[in-house]
């Protein structure tokens, strides 16, 4: 099998809540998502999606996905998409860094591998380890009482795990954490995610002020070293996300006991190939994961579901159904939330079919 063409689509994904806000005043109202279609000489087509969380969350941005694909695509025409290791080596040789731009190529090749072998991706990624996966709900940064009310609403929909967007004023964040924890059941999980927004002294204040609560602290500070400093000052369970951006940083974090859990975002690390490697390293070292991505719609959600379903439940801290946050469907067959959980299709590959009436014409074609 050979790649004959790579088509690139752009689609806007508005939010049901109107705005998603996180640390340092950052927010997005409409996400800019990129969908990739790989055509082959055997008629099979593979699909993937990449949707950065704006331009201030990670070193990634929406136009960068499409610029990266423009650089990568000419090197991939004529290559065997089922030889995914070689595809990744070609991409790494052609473009240093920029894993998020490589991710949709990698994922689309996995989709093709599933279709070529007649197997769903969760089978290829390790086999079904659970029937469905528990989801968390991200609570956009607002006033404490508004966030608490939103948590109550989502709890009524079946969610039992919540990620609270903090990383603003330390006093406000202390109030946010107390207000939201107070409306949850004892068995519900709450993660206070600062998204690198606190300085070290602010983080120290917050973890001290909420030390009596059942809450996880996620990515308090900008750097690995600052975050680990806070880790050493608290007994609260600790999650790292932004600073665990590949296998090397994961190995360092494991060796230095830097975290209890990680947030594994598929596009952040370059696609399913490296995400699977990191997933397996985490399992080997007893590190549970939130399995997700930066953002996306139906196709991103399908990739998340397959990786999460092939991960044992005791190592799946949670996953994300991004397609429930938006108002636009871009693919048929995508996972749908049922009582705070989701599962995958059993169809080959990702099990989705893009809705081209929504995607429109490609913004770029490489052949």
Swiss-Prot record:
One of its GO terms (molecular function) is amino acid binding. Its EC number is 4.2.1.171. Mg(2+) binds at residues 193, 218, 241. Binds 1 Mg(2+) ion per subunit. It is an enzyme of class 4 (lyase). It comes from the Bacteria. InterPro entries: Cis-3-h-L-Pro_dehydratase (IPR034620), DgoD-like (IPR034593), Enolase-like_C_sf (IPR036849), Enolase-like_N (IPR029017), Enolase_C-like (IPR029065), HProlDhtase (IPR054855), Mandelate_racemase_C (IPR013342), Mandelate_racemase_N_dom (IPR013341). GO terms for biological process: alpha-amino acid metabolic process; cellular response to amino acid stimulus. Induction: Is up-regulated when the bacterium is grown on c3LHyp or t3LHyp as sole carbon source. Pfam families: MR_MLE_C, MR_MLE_N. Gene3D superfamilies: Enolase-like C-terminal domain (3.20.20.120), Enolase-like, N-terminal domain (3.30.390.10). The active site is at residues 165, 265. PANTHER family: D-GALACTONATE DEHYDRATASE-RELATED, ENOLASE SUPERFAMILY MEMBER DDB_G0284701. Belongs to the mandelate racemase/muconate lactonizing enzyme family. Catalyzes the dehydration of cis-3-hydroxy-L-proline (c3LHyp) to Delta(1)-pyrroline-2-carboxylate (Pyr2C). Is likely involved in a degradation pathway that converts c3LHyp to L-proline, which allows L.aggregata to grow on c3LHyp as a sole carbon source. Also catalyzes the epimerization of c3LHyp to trans-3-hydroxy-D-proline (t3DHyp), a competing reaction occurring from the same enolate anion intermediate. L-proline, t3LHyp, t4LHyp, c4DHyp and their methylated derivatives are not substrates. This is Cis-3-hydroxy-L-proline dehydratase.
